[in-house]
A protein has these predicted regions:
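Catalytic cysteine-centered active-site loop
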Residues: 312-358
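Beta-loop motif signature
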Residues: 142-176, 180-183, 224-253
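Aromatic- and glycine-rich peptidoglycan recognition patches
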Residues: 215-217, 223, 232, 236-240, ...
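SH3/SH3-like beta-barrel superfamily modules
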Residues: 97-99, 164-204, 243-276
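Boundary regions of SH3-family modules and the immediately adjacent low-complexity/disordered segments
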Residues: 113-135, 194-228, 261-301, 305, ...
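N-terminal targeting leaders
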Residues: 22-165, 205-214
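Glycine-rich catalytic cores of cysteine/serine-nucleophile enzymes that process amide/ester linkages
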Residues: 168, 230-234, 240-261, 265-272, ...
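N-terminal secretory signal peptides that target proteins for export/translocation
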Residues: 1-12
Length: 452
């Protein structure tokens, strides 16, 4: 009887277990049927679906990039760091794809670190320029034509709007960041370059004497002669048409006689110039540096005297804003964009009729705090600037400008002045040729400017 009781209990448990199993299978079958009736969601897609109210990762990354660029005061004219964002192929949470171009590895790393703190990660295909260096890589260029156009976009980009950034001139050095391939029709390639003041742009390689690092070092080590004034006339020895070089341009010195100089042009031709038109670079650099260090006020007065000496010159002959040209004449390289030049230091109001100003101060004119033109203060209520009515350098009076609505309309309202500190060349935006990285042996990269 005891055996029969034990068996009966076991049978009961077996029957109960079977019933529970049947019920579980029925429930699972019902859930499977419901799932089949709903749209399927893959694990990858589910992982990439943002939380309710949260933007997709690529949109979050784009907004973070905009905030970062604003905080770092990135300027597309001088900062080569352009990024675009899209969905990540991995579909992982917080991931986005990033493409673009960068010549600022430190800034790019800083942005990636900021993104990581926000829970973002990237599948990066950013094109880093310049390319890894090799002995054969052409990393430098020297303008070999009288003047050439620097463009703001790659000319091979479809749908671009062609716009000239500025004119670059014979003998101007530039760093090559990226080169395009020669087209099938044998048209010249183009190069993305960085100019002496950091300005970026595209230029046809046919206008450049291309050099690798070794050749550029050799060029920098040669004795050179500097152009003392704008539009210096150079006569090639083979009877070719005259070429002209701008103030501050340095060319390889071949021979110096009392009545002439012979120099080597970037394209390999020899040319001669009048004896008073050029000067030995070493002597020029030393004289200007000694004056900057020993008497900054005397140096600024020399700027004013040179500006007044250019009165009557056509604006097109200058090739750059008047203050930039005058600074080059005295071995200072400054931004050629007026709005960047105007932010080299603290502004001076000038007070009424320039009572606060001193000879050599830079002056800026425009509308709504946006500089459009520039001049140099001469003293006694006068300044030198390109008169928009004649398109020539002229001596103008600040009091007349305020009373002459027509001239104010074209030149612009006086905004502020700026007094340089030529004895303190620590800002990469204001350098002598001796301290500029492109003139070093070996040459080096140009650091970011410090603007207010």
């Amino acid at each position: 009887m005891a055996f029969a009781s034990t068996r009966s209990s076991a049978d009961s448990r077996f029957i109960l277990g079977g019933l529970l199993l049947t019920l579980a299978l029925a429930v699972l079958g019902s859930e499977s049927a419901c799932a089949a009736a709903q749209p399927s969601v893959s694990a990858d897609n589910a992982a990439n679906i943002p939380a309710p109210g949260e933007a997709p990762s690529e949109e979050r990354a784009a907004q973070l990039w905009k905030n970062f660029a604003d905080a770092e005061a990135l300027d597309y004219r001088v900062d080569l760091l352009a990024l675009q964002f899209g969905p990540a192929a991995s579909r992982l949470p917080g991931a986005a794809a990033v493409t673009g171009i960068s010549a600022e590895p430190a800034l790019l790393a800083k942005f990636f670190a900021a993104a990581a703190r926000q829970g973002l990660s990237f599948e990066s295909a950013v094109n880093q320029v310049p390319e890894p260096k090799s002995l054969d890589l052409m990393t430098w260029g020297i303008v070999k034509v009288g003047s050439a156009e620097l463009m703001d976009l790659d000319p091979k980009t479809a749908g671009r709007t062609e716009r000239t950034v500025r004119t670059v001139v014979l003998g101007e050095r530039m760093r090559i960041l990226k080169r395009t391939s020669v087209t099938a029709s044998d048209a010249p390639g183009w190069a993305l370059v960085q100019c002496l003041d950091g300005r970026l742009g595209w230029i046809s390689e046919s206008w450049l004497a291309l050099k690798n690092d070794m050749a550029f070092v050799s060029w920098n080590r040669q004795n050179a002669a500097v152009m003392r004034r704008p539009n210096t006339e150079l006569r090639p020895e083979n009877g070719d048409a005259l070429v002209f070089a701008e103030a501050g341009i340095q060319l390889y010195q071949l021979e110096h006689q009392p009545d002439y100089w012979e120099v080597l042009l970037p394209d390999g031709r020899k040319a001669k110039a009048a004896g008073t038109a050029l000067e030995d670079v070493s002597a020029w650099q030393q004289r200007e540096e000694e004056l900057r260090r020993s008497s900054p006020s005397a140096y600024l007065k020399a700027l004013a005297a040179s500006a007044e000496g250019l009165v009557g010159s056509k604006a097109e002959v200058l090739g750059a804003p008047l203050p930039v040209v005058v600074l080059r004449m005295h071995d200072l390289l400054a931004p050629a964009d007026i709005d960047r030049l105007a932010r080299l230091g603290a502004p001076l109001s000038g007070e009424r009729d320039g009572a606060e100003l001193k000879a050599g101060d830079l002056m800026f004119f425009g509308e709504h705090d946006e500089p459009q033109s520039a001049g140099i203060w001469l003293g006694e209520g006068r300044f030198a600037a390109v008169d928009p009515q004649t398109d020539r350098v002229a001596v103008l009076k600040l009091s007349d400008l305020r009373q002459n609505a027509k001239k104010t309309k074209t030149l612009g309202t006086f905004l502020w002045a700026l007094r340089l500190k030529p004895q303190e060349l620590q800002n990469p935006c204001l350098l002598s040729s001796r301290s500029h990285p492109f003139f070093q042996t070996p040459p080096a990269e140009l650091k970011r400017c410090q603007l207010r």
